[in-house]
Swiss-Prot record:
Organism: Maricaulis maris (strain MCS10) (Caulobacter maris)
Highest taxon above the source species: Bacteria
GO cellular component terms attached to this protein's record: cytosol
Pfam family, one: Trm112p
Similarity comment: Belongs to the UPF0434 family.
Protein name, entry field: UPF0434 protein Mmar10_2939
InterPro entries, per the entry: Trm112-like
Length: 63
């Protein structure tokens, strides 16, 4: 993977981001490069350190 793909999300950004569906806080999965919304059961991708907070771009979490 290139360095741009492995960039982490800014911790300050994580403090203010919420799930657009549930408005709940998100958990960052560093290995998968995703922001996890437990309430919505969605994983939002992080590309080049930028969270893609569109429900249509999110992956449905497995139960």
């Amino acid at each position: 993977m290139s360095d741009t793909q492995t960039r982490d999300v800014d911790p300050k950004l994580l403090e203010i981001l919420v799930c657009p569906v549930t408005r709940e806080t998100l958990r960052y999965d560093r290995e998968a490069h995703e922001l996890i919304s437990e309430g919505a059961g969605l994983a939002y991708p992080v590309r080049d350190g930028i969270p893609i907070m569109l429900p249509d771009e999110a992956r449905q979490l497995d139960d």
